[in-house]
Amino acid sequence: MTAGIDLNDIKRRMDGAINAFKSDLASLRTGRASANILDPVMVEAYGSRVALNTVANITVPEPRMLGVSIWDKSMVGAVDRAIRESNLGLNPIVDGQNLRIPLPELNEERRKSLVKVAHGYAENSKVAIRHVRRDGMDSLKKAEKDGEIGKDDARSLSEKLQKMTDDTISDIDRLLAEKEKEIMQV
């Protein structure tokens, strides 16, 4: 911790924004099956809404198929309904206490809309990172104004903060480009 500004805390907060972005990207459905696709699905269970992975086990038995093993047989209908109503474009096939979910081929229009969603996630993450930078700059200016640090130290810390911001945003751009390539791959 330098007087007035904690660069480690700022780095931790920026890393948090990147981790949130990675998790958002993982939930986007590409051509391959991934258990993360079902992360946003909430199931009406026992009088409240819970995440699907708290009432079932999600597997990927084949590249274009998801398997959902529901622990409580009475929950099969609720899980099936939750997946169908999740706007993921998935239609589960009930097989006893399990669901099989074939992943349809993505058409060009759907691919482009997924890329737009990914760009939206990236922009939200960049905004969060800029907010962290702004908080750091405000702390820096306050410390300089209060006489805790000198002008040279303030300038040096400001440059470090800007470099951290630039590096973090370039990481987000790189992750976005990788995901975009993955989505558009036929």
Curated annotation (Swiss-Prot):
InterPro entries: Ribosome_recyc_fac (IPR002661), Ribosome_recyc_fac_dom (IPR023584), RRF_sf (IPR036191)
Record keywords, A-Z: Cytoplasm, Protein biosynthesis
Matching PANTHER family: MITOCHONDRIAL RIBOSOME RECYCLING FACTOR PSEUDO 1, RIBOSOME RECYCLING FACTOR
A single Gene Ontology CC term: cytosol
UniProt source species: Allorhizobium ampelinum (strain ATCC BAA-846 / DSM 112012 / S4)
Gene transcribed to yield this protein: frr
Family named by the database record: Belongs to the RRF family.
Name of the molecule in the record: Ribosome-recycling factor
GO MF: ribosomal large subunit binding
Gene Ontology process terms (BP): cytoplasmic translational termination
Source organism superkingdom: Bacteria
Subcellular location: Cytoplasm
Function: Responsible for the release of ribosomes from messenger RNA at the termination of protein biosynthesis. May increase the efficiency of translation by recycling ribosomes from one round of translation to another.
